[in-house]
Amino acid sequence: MKLAIIGGYNFERHSKSMGKLKNIELRFHDGVPKKNNKKVLENLIKDTDCVIIVQMVCSHSSMWDAKDVARKYNKKIYYSQAKGLASVLTMIEKEHGIRTA
């Protein structure tokens, strides 16, 4: 399973420190708008299974761009109030019935 996590700049570093995740590939965008933001997000999201928007650490602009791209590619969107990677992965485990570690 491939997940796109939008928002938060520490997730990528923490995912490496957690070790290998079982059957999960994580892709990250820090949620800060960039030049050609929608295209950057499209390249990140188009090959994933779902998108997780971490609301507390994602700009409105990046959130709307991610939602537009996810809809274009018919990807499921989840919203997380939690800021920690472990909480986000727990949410995915509950939704999909899979173990991430």
From Swiss-Prot:
Pfam family, one: DUF2325
InterPro entries attached to this UniProt entry: UCP020408
Domain of life (superkingdom): Bacteria
Similarity comment: Belongs to the UPF0751 family.
Official protein name in the record: UPF0751 protein DSY3086
Native organism: Desulfitobacterium hafniense (strain Y51)
Species classification: Bacteria, Bacillati, Bacillota, Clostridia, Eubacteriales
